[in-house]
Amino acid sequence: MNKEQLEKMKNGKGFIAALDQSGGSTPKALKEYGVNEDQYSNEDEMFQLVHDMRTRVVTSPSFSPDKILGAILFEQTMDREVEGKYTADYLADKGVVPFLKVDKGLAEEQNGVQLMKPIDNLDSLLDRANERHIFGTKMRSNILELNEQGIKDVVEQQFEVAKQIIAKGLVPIIEPEVNINAKDKAEIEKVLKAELKKGLDSLNADQLVMLKLTIPTEPNLYKELAEHPNVVRVVVLSGGYSREKANELLKDNDELIASFSRALASDLRADQSKEEFDKALGDAVESIYDASVNKN
């Protein structure tokens, strides 16, 4: 593990850029960027277009390591190059810590939750991540209803996989998303917090994780988790809120920082000039940084 990157993730001021839309969500991400499905004819062309978009983001002067601590990549992005270097090396050289999304998507809903599908190639994927100088990983589950068994299952699965990731020398981001429209969102979050605390308490002193959570209904609910000795950082997802709304809610939560995807890229368009693109990205970065660093 890179100690300098660990220090940056633990104590740095800023947020994490989530650039990890994968196969299923790519057409939607491209469409929002202004690239329609008639502009590519197969998956390779689609992934090249999305890589072009991500290259434009990470090479922009607005994508500054003074504001952006880390970036989460999709497997395809890890294997591609930016300006002649593998993406993770390009980011690390720029001062941004690289993470890799490792999950294979969500299983069918059961007990009010969606567990992760089995990650059959996890071992070889983590070996490749190490070769590519990736610092950590990210994997997402989804909680839709107040169901204690379901929430317990989500957290147990996350920690089980997290321990395999830690054994390979990487720092896992555990992401049990709570749907922002869930009827009993505040109650779900209390149960989730208790289960996460149990999981964290089961780790050895040298087993470090990060958490990526939905912004809680009750401000500072997760402060205790952020202060847990095994937690490097707690980051939050935008989860369907607009950037303005997500930033506003984030400001009420001390010690939590953003890890936004859609809320970061929502004003970026393929046909913008370099100046327009850099300004739109810069405005987004500035506001998300502010919500991550300057609290109410």
Swiss-Prot record:
Keyword Lyase: yes
Enzyme class: lyase
GO biological process, alphabetically ordered: glycolytic process
Catalytic activity: beta-D-fructose 1,6-bisphosphate = D-glyceraldehyde 3-phosphate + dihydroxyacetone phosphate
Coiled coil: none
Pathway(s): Carbohydrate degradation; glycolysis; D-glyceraldehyde 3-phosphate and glycerone phosphate from D-glucose: step 4/4
GO molecular function: fructose-bisphosphate aldolase activity
Residue positions of the active site: 175, 212
Pfam families on file: Glycolytic (PF00274)
Keywords: Glycolysis, Lyase, Schiff base
Enzyme Commission designation: 4.1.2.13
Classification via Gene3D superfamilies: Aldolase class I
Top-level taxon in the UniProt lineage: Bacteria
Protein family membership: Belongs to the class I fructose-bisphosphate aldolase family.
Name listed for the protein in its UniProt record: Fructose-bisphosphate aldolase class 1
